[in-house]
Amino acid sequence: MARPAAGPGGISKFGNDFGLQRWRNTPRYDQTQPLEGSVCGYGLSNPFHESLFSCPAASWPQAKLGRPNTPQEPSKDLKRILSQISPKRIEATIRKLVSFGTRHTLSTQTNATHGIGAARDWIASEFQRYADASDGRLTVKVIGYEQQPDGSRVLFPVRISDVVATLKGSEDPERVYVVSGHYDSRASDPLDYKTDAPGANDDASGVAVSLEIARVMSQRNLPRPKATIVFAAVAGEEQGLLGSNFLAQTYRNSSTNVEGMFTNDIIGSSTADDGTKEPHVIRLFAQGVPPLNVENQAMREKRLMIGGENDTPARQLARFVKETAENKYTDMQVSVIYRLDRYLRGGDHRPFLEAGYPAARFTEPNENYAHQHQNIRIEKDPKTGKDIQYGDLPEFCDFDFISRVGKVNAAALWNLAMSPGMPRNVRVDTSDLSNDSKFTWDPPAGGNAGVGGYEIVWRSTIAPFWTNVMDVGMVQAATIDLSKDNVIFGIRARGKNGERGVAVLPFP
Protein backbone atom coordinates (compact mmCIF):
# COMPACT_ATOMS: atom_id res chain seq x y z
CA MET A 1 0.00 0.00 0.00
CA ALA A 2 1.38 3.41 -0.93
CA ARG A 3 1.60 6.08 1.71
CA PRO A 4 -1.39 8.46 1.76
CA ALA A 5 -0.95 11.74 -0.05
CA ALA A 6 -0.77 14.92 1.94
CA GLY A 7 -3.25 17.71 1.57
CA PRO A 8 -2.65 21.46 1.82
CA GLY A 9 0.05 22.42 4.28
CA GLY A 10 1.21 18.83 4.49
CA ILE A 11 -1.86 17.70 6.46
CA SER A 12 -2.66 14.08 5.77
CA LYS A 13 -5.83 13.35 3.83
CA PHE A 14 -6.84 11.25 6.80
CA GLY A 15 -8.05 14.49 8.42
CA ASN A 16 -7.08 17.30 10.72
CA ASP A 17 -6.50 14.90 13.60
CA PHE A 18 -3.50 13.77 11.51
CA GLY A 19 -5.30 10.52 10.85
CA LEU A 20 -4.03 8.83 14.00
CA GLN A 21 -7.07 6.67 14.62
CA ARG A 22 -7.81 6.06 10.97
CA TRP A 23 -4.18 5.17 10.31
CA ARG A 24 -4.42 2.42 12.87
CA ASN A 25 -7.55 1.07 11.24
CA THR A 26 -6.27 1.00 7.66
CA PRO A 27 -4.01 -1.62 6.04
CA ARG A 28 -0.34 -1.04 6.69
CA TYR A 29 2.05 -0.07 3.93
CA ASP A 30 4.30 -2.87 2.70
CA GLN A 31 6.53 -3.48 5.71
CA THR A 32 8.41 -6.34 4.12
CA GLN A 33 10.57 -3.83 2.21
CA PRO A 34 12.94 -1.19 3.56
CA LEU A 35 11.55 2.32 3.60
CA GLU A 36 12.52 4.54 0.69
CA GLY A 37 13.06 8.16 1.59
CA SER A 38 12.51 9.79 4.93
CA VAL A 39 11.06 12.82 6.59
CA CYS A 40 13.67 15.37 7.67
CA GLY A 41 16.17 12.53 7.49
CA TYR A 42 14.48 10.67 10.34
CA GLY A 43 13.07 7.73 8.38
CA LEU A 44 9.57 8.51 9.66
CA SER A 45 6.69 6.80 7.92
CA ASN A 46 3.49 7.74 9.72
CA PRO A 47 1.35 10.51 8.16
CA PHE A 48 1.15 12.17 11.59
CA HIS A 49 4.92 12.55 11.56
CA GLU A 50 4.92 13.70 7.95
CA SER A 51 2.44 16.41 8.86
CA LEU A 52 4.31 17.44 11.98
CA PHE A 53 7.71 17.79 10.33
CA SER A 54 6.46 19.40 7.13
CA CYS A 55 4.80 22.33 8.90
CA PRO A 56 6.63 25.67 8.49
CA ALA A 57 7.45 26.01 12.20
CA ALA A 58 9.37 22.73 12.25
CA SER A 59 12.48 24.23 10.64
CA TRP A 60 12.69 27.34 12.85
CA PRO A 61 15.14 28.78 13.64
CA GLN A 62 16.68 28.66 10.18
CA ALA A 63 20.43 28.84 10.66
CA LYS A 64 22.48 30.65 8.02
CA LEU A 65 25.68 28.96 9.07
CA GLY A 66 27.06 25.46 9.05
CA ARG A 67 25.66 22.72 6.84
CA PRO A 68 23.09 19.93 7.09
CA ASN A 69 24.15 17.03 9.28
CA THR A 70 24.20 13.95 7.05
CA PRO A 71 24.62 10.24 7.82
CA GLN A 72 28.15 8.92 8.02
CA GLU A 73 29.16 6.78 5.05
CA PRO A 74 30.65 3.39 5.99
CA SER A 75 34.38 3.07 5.43
CA LYS A 76 35.88 0.49 3.09
CA ASP A 77 36.85 -1.70 6.04
CA LEU A 78 33.38 -1.48 7.55
CA LYS A 79 31.80 -2.51 4.26
CA ARG A 80 34.03 -5.59 4.29
CA ILE A 81 32.92 -6.38 7.83
CA LEU A 82 29.24 -6.04 7.02
CA SER A 83 29.54 -8.22 3.93
CA GLN A 84 30.92 -11.11 6.00
CA ILE A 85 28.24 -11.35 8.68
CA SER A 86 26.65 -14.71 7.96
CA PRO A 87 23.01 -15.74 8.55
CA LYS A 88 24.08 -19.39 8.31
CA ARG A 89 26.65 -19.02 11.09
CA ILE A 90 24.12 -17.19 13.23
CA GLU A 91 21.60 -19.98 12.66
CA ALA A 92 24.18 -22.63 13.57
CA THR A 93 24.99 -20.81 16.82
CA ILE A 94 21.35 -20.51 17.81
CA ARG A 95 20.62 -24.17 17.08
CA LYS A 96 23.68 -25.25 19.03
CA LEU A 97 22.62 -23.24 22.08
CA VAL A 98 19.11 -24.67 21.85
CA SER A 99 20.59 -28.19 21.82
CA PHE A 100 21.65 -27.85 25.46
CA GLY A 101 18.02 -28.36 26.53
CA THR A 102 17.76 -25.71 29.20
CA ARG A 103 20.21 -22.90 29.88
CA HIS A 104 18.50 -21.86 33.09
CA THR A 105 20.92 -20.15 35.45
CA LEU A 106 20.21 -22.77 38.13
CA SER A 107 20.61 -25.74 35.78
CA THR A 108 23.58 -28.11 35.86
CA GLN A 109 27.07 -26.76 35.29
CA THR A 110 28.82 -30.14 35.26
CA ASN A 111 27.08 -31.95 32.40
CA ALA A 112 29.03 -31.72 29.13
CA THR A 113 25.96 -31.69 26.87
CA HIS A 114 23.08 -30.30 28.93
CA GLY A 115 22.48 -27.17 30.96
CA ILE A 116 24.01 -23.76 31.34
CA GLY A 117 27.50 -25.04 32.09
CA ALA A 118 27.69 -26.83 28.76
CA ALA A 119 26.46 -23.69 27.00
CA ARG A 120 29.05 -21.55 28.80
CA ASP A 121 31.88 -23.88 27.85
CA TRP A 122 30.80 -24.05 24.22
CA ILE A 123 30.55 -20.25 23.92
CA ALA A 124 34.00 -19.88 25.47
CA SER A 125 35.43 -22.45 23.04
CA GLU A 126 33.92 -20.59 20.07
CA PHE A 127 35.37 -17.27 21.18
CA GLN A 128 38.70 -19.01 21.75
CA ARG A 129 38.58 -20.48 18.24
CA TYR A 130 38.26 -16.96 16.85
CA ALA A 131 41.03 -15.78 19.16
CA ASP A 132 43.37 -18.52 17.95
CA ALA A 133 42.86 -17.32 14.38
CA SER A 134 43.29 -13.64 15.26
CA ASP A 135 47.08 -13.52 15.68
CA GLY A 136 46.72 -12.37 19.28
CA ARG A 137 44.17 -9.63 18.64
CA LEU A 138 41.32 -11.29 20.53
CA THR A 139 41.61 -12.59 24.10
CA VAL A 140 39.01 -14.62 25.99
CA LYS A 141 38.18 -14.89 29.69
CA VAL A 142 35.42 -16.49 31.73
CA ILE A 143 34.77 -14.35 34.78
CA GLY A 144 32.18 -14.71 37.50
CA TYR A 145 31.17 -14.92 41.13
CA GLU A 146 29.11 -17.00 43.56
CA GLN A 147 25.54 -15.72 43.79
CA GLN A 148 23.83 -16.48 47.09
CA PRO A 149 20.10 -17.25 47.45
CA ASP A 150 18.09 -14.05 47.21
CA GLY A 151 14.65 -15.18 48.38
CA SER A 152 13.29 -14.54 44.92
CA ARG A 153 14.72 -16.14 41.77
CA VAL A 154 17.90 -17.71 43.14
CA LEU A 155 17.04 -20.79 45.20
CA PHE A 156 20.54 -21.91 46.15
CA PRO A 157 24.15 -20.75 45.74
CA VAL A 158 25.14 -20.73 42.08
CA ARG A 159 28.10 -19.69 39.98
CA ILE A 160 27.32 -16.81 37.60
CA SER A 161 29.75 -16.82 34.67
CA ASP A 162 30.28 -14.25 31.93
CA VAL A 163 32.23 -15.14 28.80
CA VAL A 164 34.16 -12.06 27.67
CA ALA A 165 36.18 -11.68 24.46
CA THR A 166 38.25 -8.50 24.14
CA LEU A 167 39.52 -6.98 20.89
CA LYS A 168 42.09 -4.50 22.18
CA GLY A 169 42.30 -1.12 20.51
CA SER A 170 45.43 -0.04 18.66
CA GLU A 171 45.56 3.68 19.56
CA ASP A 172 43.14 4.33 22.44
CA PRO A 173 42.83 0.93 24.16
CA GLU A 174 41.61 2.39 27.45
CA ARG A 175 38.37 3.50 25.74
CA VAL A 176 35.97 0.54 25.68
CA TYR A 177 32.73 -0.40 23.92
CA VAL A 178 30.73 -3.46 24.95
CA VAL A 179 28.18 -5.58 23.09
CA SER A 180 26.37 -8.42 24.87
CA GLY A 181 23.67 -11.04 24.74
CA HIS A 182 22.57 -13.31 27.59
CA TYR A 183 23.00 -17.04 27.22
CA ASP A 184 20.70 -18.17 30.02
CA SER A 185 17.09 -19.12 29.24
CA ARG A 186 13.86 -19.87 31.10
CA ALA A 187 10.55 -21.70 30.78
CA SER A 188 7.14 -20.48 31.97
CA ASP A 189 8.10 -20.72 35.64
CA PRO A 190 11.20 -18.59 36.29
CA LEU A 191 12.27 -21.06 39.00
CA ASP A 192 11.92 -24.17 36.81
CA TYR A 193 15.49 -25.15 36.01
CA LYS A 194 14.74 -28.67 34.73
CA THR A 195 12.20 -28.21 31.92
CA ASP A 196 13.68 -27.62 28.47
CA ALA A 197 13.89 -23.91 27.71
CA PRO A 198 15.29 -23.50 24.17
CA GLY A 199 15.62 -19.70 24.34
CA ALA A 200 16.25 -19.38 20.61
CA ASN A 201 15.13 -15.77 20.41
CA ASP A 202 15.57 -14.91 24.10
CA ASP A 203 18.47 -14.78 23.93
CA ALA A 204 20.49 -17.14 21.78
CA SER A 205 19.92 -14.56 19.04
CA GLY A 206 21.81 -11.90 20.98
CA VAL A 207 24.66 -14.26 21.84
CA ALA A 208 24.90 -15.26 18.18
CA VAL A 209 25.37 -11.60 17.21
CA SER A 210 28.17 -11.12 19.76
CA LEU A 211 29.93 -14.25 18.49
CA GLU A 212 29.53 -13.41 14.82
CA ILE A 213 30.77 -9.83 15.11
CA ALA A 214 33.74 -11.03 17.17
CA ARG A 215 34.58 -13.59 14.48
CA VAL A 216 34.54 -11.05 11.69
CA MET A 217 36.19 -8.09 13.42
CA SER A 218 39.06 -10.11 14.90
CA GLN A 219 40.32 -11.34 11.53
CA ARG A 220 43.98 -10.64 10.76
CA ASN A 221 43.22 -9.09 7.38
CA LEU A 222 41.37 -6.18 9.01
CA PRO A 223 42.95 -3.26 10.85
CA ARG A 224 42.56 -3.21 14.60
CA PRO A 225 39.91 -0.83 15.88
CA LYS A 226 41.44 2.24 17.51
CA ALA A 227 39.45 1.73 20.72
CA THR A 228 38.72 -1.57 22.46
CA ILE A 229 35.61 -3.63 21.68
CA VAL A 230 34.34 -6.24 24.14
CA PHE A 231 32.03 -9.06 23.03
CA ALA A 232 30.20 -10.65 25.95
CA ALA A 233 27.81 -13.48 26.68
CA VAL A 234 26.38 -13.03 30.16
CA ALA A 235 24.36 -15.28 32.47
CA GLY A 236 21.67 -14.69 35.07
CA GLU A 237 19.62 -12.19 33.05
CA GLU A 238 16.36 -14.00 33.73
CA GLN A 239 17.15 -14.16 37.45
CA GLY A 240 17.73 -10.42 37.78
CA LEU A 241 20.39 -9.13 35.33
CA LEU A 242 23.03 -10.80 37.49
CA GLY A 243 25.81 -11.41 34.98
CA SER A 244 25.49 -8.00 33.39
CA ASN A 245 25.54 -6.32 36.77
CA PHE A 246 28.72 -8.19 37.65
CA LEU A 247 30.35 -7.15 34.38
CA ALA A 248 29.31 -3.51 34.73
CA GLN A 249 30.53 -3.34 38.33
CA THR A 250 33.80 -5.03 37.35
CA TYR A 251 34.43 -2.24 34.87
CA ARG A 252 33.31 0.44 37.30
CA ASN A 253 35.50 -0.88 40.12
CA SER A 254 38.53 -0.78 37.82
CA SER A 255 37.61 2.74 36.58
CA THR A 256 37.32 1.45 33.02
CA ASN A 257 36.27 4.11 30.52
CA VAL A 258 33.26 2.40 28.92
CA GLU A 259 31.88 4.97 26.47
CA GLY A 260 29.10 2.79 25.06
CA MET A 261 27.32 -0.51 25.65
CA PHE A 262 24.69 -2.35 23.62
CA THR A 263 22.68 -5.36 24.65
CA ASN A 264 20.93 -7.45 22.02
CA ASP A 265 17.98 -9.17 23.65
CA ILE A 266 15.11 -10.71 21.68
CA ILE A 267 16.33 -9.78 18.21
CA GLY A 268 15.31 -13.04 16.54
CA SER A 269 12.17 -12.20 14.58
CA SER A 270 10.31 -9.27 13.07
CA THR A 271 6.92 -11.01 13.07
CA ALA A 272 4.19 -10.03 15.54
CA ASP A 273 1.53 -12.36 16.91
CA ASP A 274 -0.92 -11.04 14.29
CA GLY A 275 1.47 -11.89 11.45
CA THR A 276 2.67 -8.33 10.88
CA LYS A 277 6.22 -8.31 9.51
CA GLU A 278 8.77 -5.51 9.70
CA PRO A 279 11.99 -7.27 8.66
CA HIS A 280 13.96 -4.08 8.05
CA VAL A 281 13.31 -2.34 11.39
CA ILE A 282 15.07 -2.76 14.73
CA ARG A 283 14.13 -0.92 17.92
CA LEU A 284 16.80 0.77 20.03
CA PHE A 285 15.73 1.72 23.56
CA ALA A 286 17.58 4.67 25.10
CA GLN A 287 17.02 5.97 28.63
CA GLY A 288 16.27 9.59 29.44
CA VAL A 289 17.25 11.21 32.75
CA PRO A 290 19.96 9.11 34.45
CA PRO A 291 19.33 7.54 37.87
CA LEU A 292 20.21 9.65 40.91
CA ASN A 293 23.16 7.45 41.83
CA VAL A 294 24.74 8.55 38.53
CA GLU A 295 23.61 12.17 38.31
CA ASN A 296 22.95 13.93 41.62
CA GLN A 297 19.92 16.08 42.35
CA ALA A 298 21.71 19.35 41.60
CA MET A 299 22.86 18.06 38.23
CA ARG A 300 19.40 16.72 37.48
CA GLU A 301 17.81 20.08 38.27
CA LYS A 302 20.30 21.81 35.98
CA ARG A 303 19.55 19.30 33.21
CA LEU A 304 15.83 19.92 33.53
CA MET A 305 16.34 23.69 33.66
CA ILE A 306 18.19 23.75 30.32
CA GLY A 307 15.88 21.22 28.66
CA GLY A 308 18.52 18.52 28.50
CA GLU A 309 16.37 15.58 29.55
CA ASN A 310 16.45 14.27 25.96
CA ASP A 311 20.22 14.61 25.65
CA THR A 312 21.57 12.10 28.12
CA PRO A 313 24.64 10.03 27.20
CA ALA A 314 22.41 7.05 26.34
CA ARG A 315 20.35 9.10 23.90
CA GLN A 316 23.43 10.64 22.33
CA LEU A 317 24.67 7.09 21.81
CA ALA A 318 21.36 6.18 20.15
CA ARG A 319 21.60 9.21 17.85
CA PHE A 320 25.05 8.05 16.84
CA VAL A 321 23.67 4.61 15.94
CA LYS A 322 20.92 6.18 13.85
CA GLU A 323 23.49 8.28 12.01
CA THR A 324 26.01 5.51 11.32
CA ALA A 325 24.08 2.24 11.10
CA GLU A 326 21.00 3.06 9.04
CA ASN A 327 22.08 2.66 5.43
CA LYS A 328 21.90 0.41 2.38
CA TYR A 329 24.72 -1.78 3.68
CA THR A 330 22.82 -2.76 6.83
CA ASP A 331 19.47 -2.61 5.00
CA MET A 332 17.84 -1.58 8.26
CA GLN A 333 15.91 1.29 9.81
CA VAL A 334 16.85 2.01 13.42
CA SER A 335 13.73 3.01 15.34
CA VAL A 336 15.02 4.86 18.40
CA ILE A 337 12.63 4.58 21.35
CA TYR A 338 13.14 7.26 23.97
CA ARG A 339 12.63 5.15 27.09
CA LEU A 340 14.63 2.70 29.19
CA ASP A 341 12.84 -0.43 27.99
CA ARG A 342 9.44 -1.91 27.17
CA TYR A 343 6.76 -1.90 29.84
CA LEU A 344 7.18 -4.63 32.49
CA ARG A 345 10.54 -5.70 31.02
CA GLY A 346 14.20 -5.19 31.79
CA GLY A 347 17.52 -5.78 30.08
CA ASP A 348 21.26 -6.05 30.53
CA HIS A 349 21.87 -2.44 29.52
CA ARG A 350 20.34 -1.29 32.80
CA PRO A 351 23.24 -2.29 35.10
CA PHE A 352 25.61 -0.38 32.82
CA LEU A 353 23.39 2.69 32.99
CA GLU A 354 23.32 2.38 36.78
CA ALA A 355 27.11 2.14 36.77
CA GLY A 356 27.23 5.48 34.92
CA TYR A 357 27.90 4.17 31.42
CA PRO A 358 25.98 5.08 28.23
CA ALA A 359 23.99 2.00 27.22
CA ALA A 360 21.04 1.04 25.02
CA ARG A 361 19.02 -2.04 24.09
CA PHE A 362 18.30 -3.54 20.67
CA THR A 363 15.00 -5.46 20.44
CA GLU A 364 12.92 -6.69 17.52
CA PRO A 365 10.10 -4.38 16.30
CA ASN A 366 7.25 -6.78 17.08
CA GLU A 367 7.09 -9.39 19.80
CA ASN A 368 5.14 -12.63 20.00
CA TYR A 369 4.70 -13.50 23.66
CA ALA A 370 3.70 -17.08 22.85
CA HIS A 371 7.37 -17.51 21.93
CA GLN A 372 8.88 -15.96 25.06
CA HIS A 373 9.16 -17.47 28.55
CA GLN A 374 6.85 -20.36 27.62
CA ASN A 375 6.96 -24.11 28.11
CA ILE A 376 6.93 -25.92 24.76
CA ARG A 377 3.33 -26.98 24.12
CA ILE A 378 0.38 -26.67 21.76
CA GLU A 379 -2.90 -25.14 22.91
CA LYS A 380 -6.12 -24.16 21.21
CA ASP A 381 -6.78 -20.48 20.67
CA PRO A 382 -10.07 -19.86 22.53
CA LYS A 383 -11.10 -17.28 19.92
CA THR A 384 -10.29 -19.11 16.70
CA GLY A 385 -10.01 -22.73 17.75
CA LYS A 386 -6.67 -22.99 15.94
CA ASP A 387 -3.63 -24.64 17.45
CA ILE A 388 -1.00 -22.31 18.89
CA GLN A 389 2.57 -23.51 19.22
CA TYR A 390 4.13 -22.12 22.39
CA GLY A 391 7.83 -22.02 23.11
CA ASP A 392 10.94 -20.09 22.09
CA LEU A 393 11.91 -22.38 19.22
CA PRO A 394 14.40 -21.87 16.35
CA GLU A 395 11.61 -22.31 13.81
CA PHE A 396 10.28 -18.90 14.80
CA CYS A 397 13.61 -17.12 14.19
CA ASP A 398 14.40 -15.17 11.03
CA PHE A 399 18.13 -15.67 10.59
CA ASP A 400 18.44 -13.13 7.78
CA PHE A 401 16.81 -10.55 10.05
CA ILE A 402 19.20 -11.38 12.89
CA SER A 403 22.17 -10.98 10.55
CA ARG A 404 20.93 -7.51 9.57
CA VAL A 405 20.64 -6.61 13.26
CA GLY A 406 24.20 -7.86 13.60
CA LYS A 407 25.22 -5.49 10.82
CA VAL A 408 23.60 -2.57 12.66
CA ASN A 409 25.62 -3.48 15.76
CA ALA A 410 28.80 -3.91 13.76
CA ALA A 411 28.37 -0.57 12.01
CA ALA A 412 27.79 1.25 15.28
CA LEU A 413 30.64 -0.47 17.13
CA TRP A 414 33.19 -0.04 14.34
CA ASN A 415 32.37 3.63 13.88
CA LEU A 416 32.54 4.19 17.63
CA ALA A 417 35.88 2.43 17.93
CA MET A 418 37.40 4.18 14.89
CA SER A 419 36.28 7.70 15.86
CA PRO A 420 37.56 9.83 18.76
CA GLY A 421 36.02 9.55 22.19
CA MET A 422 33.61 12.04 23.70
CA PRO A 423 34.89 15.54 24.57
CA ARG A 424 35.06 16.21 28.32
CA ASN A 425 33.86 19.12 30.45
CA VAL A 426 31.70 20.54 27.67
CA ARG A 427 30.37 23.92 28.77
CA VAL A 428 28.17 26.72 27.46
CA ASP A 429 28.79 30.25 28.74
CA THR A 430 25.80 31.74 30.58
CA SER A 431 27.66 34.54 32.35
CA ASP A 432 25.62 37.22 30.57
CA LEU A 433 22.67 37.68 28.22
CA SER A 434 23.58 37.32 24.55
CA ASN A 435 22.14 36.09 21.27
CA ASP A 436 25.18 34.03 20.40
CA SER A 437 26.48 30.86 22.06
CA LYS A 438 29.96 30.38 23.50
CA PHE A 439 31.35 26.92 24.21
CA THR A 440 34.45 25.41 25.79
CA TRP A 441 35.53 21.79 26.13
CA ASP A 442 38.44 19.51 26.93
CA PRO A 443 39.79 16.74 24.70
CA PRO A 444 38.50 13.17 25.03
CA ALA A 445 39.95 11.01 27.80
CA GLY A 446 42.50 9.62 25.36
CA GLY A 447 43.73 13.10 24.42
CA ASN A 448 43.92 14.90 21.09
CA ALA A 449 46.26 12.43 19.35
CA GLY A 450 43.59 11.00 17.06
CA VAL A 451 41.47 14.13 16.81
CA GLY A 452 41.37 16.05 13.54
CA GLY A 453 39.03 18.77 14.76
CA TYR A 454 35.79 19.48 16.56
CA GLU A 455 32.24 20.07 15.39
CA ILE A 456 29.24 21.84 16.88
CA VAL A 457 25.94 20.15 16.07
CA TRP A 458 22.44 21.39 16.77
CA ARG A 459 18.76 20.79 16.20
CA SER A 460 15.49 22.45 17.10
CA THR A 461 14.24 21.57 20.57
CA ILE A 462 11.48 19.34 19.15
CA ALA A 463 13.69 17.47 16.67
CA PRO A 464 14.86 13.98 17.72
CA PHE A 465 18.18 13.94 15.81
CA TRP A 466 20.94 16.39 14.91
CA THR A 467 20.09 18.43 11.82
CA ASN A 468 22.98 20.92 11.47
CA VAL A 469 26.72 20.89 11.96
CA MET A 470 29.59 23.39 11.90
CA ASP A 471 33.27 22.44 11.77
CA VAL A 472 35.18 24.72 14.15
CA GLY A 473 38.63 23.19 13.69
CA MET A 474 41.27 22.07 16.14
CA VAL A 475 40.18 24.33 19.00
CA GLN A 476 38.71 23.92 22.47
CA ALA A 477 36.52 27.02 22.46
CA ALA A 478 34.15 28.46 19.89
CA THR A 479 31.38 31.03 19.54
CA ILE A 480 28.48 30.48 17.17
CA ASP A 481 26.02 33.13 15.99
CA LEU A 482 22.94 31.21 17.06
CA SER A 483 21.05 31.61 20.32
CA LYS A 484 21.39 28.82 22.87
CA ASP A 485 17.80 29.62 23.89
CA ASN A 486 16.34 28.33 20.63
CA VAL A 487 18.14 25.07 19.84
CA ILE A 488 19.87 22.10 21.46
CA PHE A 489 23.63 22.03 20.93
CA GLY A 490 26.21 19.27 21.09
CA ILE A 491 30.00 19.13 20.74
CA ARG A 492 31.71 16.17 19.09
CA ALA A 493 35.24 15.27 18.02
CA ARG A 494 36.13 14.36 14.46
CA GLY A 495 38.97 11.98 13.75
CA LYS A 496 41.82 12.57 11.35
CA ASN A 497 40.18 9.85 9.27
CA GLY A 498 36.97 11.90 9.11
CA GLU A 499 35.04 9.64 11.49
CA ARG A 500 32.71 11.63 13.73
CA GLY A 501 32.29 10.75 17.39
CA VAL A 502 29.39 10.92 19.82
CA ALA A 503 28.14 14.41 20.66
CA VAL A 504 28.00 15.77 24.21
CA LEU A 505 25.42 18.22 25.56
CA PRO A 506 27.03 21.41 26.97
CA PHE A 507 26.07 22.39 30.52
CA PRO A 508 26.30 25.89 32.01
From Swiss-Prot:
Origin: domain of life: Eukaryota
Cofactor remark: Binds 2 Zn(2+) ions per subunit.
InterPro entries, A to Z: FN3_dom, FN3_sf, M28_fam, Peptidase_M28
GO molecular-function term, one example from the UniProt record: metal ion binding
Designated name of the protein: Probable zinc metalloprotease MCYG_04217
Species name: Arthroderma otae (strain ATCC MYA-4605 / CBS 113480)
Binding site for Zn(2+) 1: 182, 202, 265
Localization annotation: Secreted
PROSITE patterns associated with the record: FN3
Record bears the keyword ATP-binding: no
Family membership: Belongs to the peptidase M28 family. M28B subfamily.
PANTHER family xrefs: METALLOPEPTIDASE M28 FAMILY MEMBER, PEPTIDASE M28 DOMAIN-CONTAINING PROTEIN
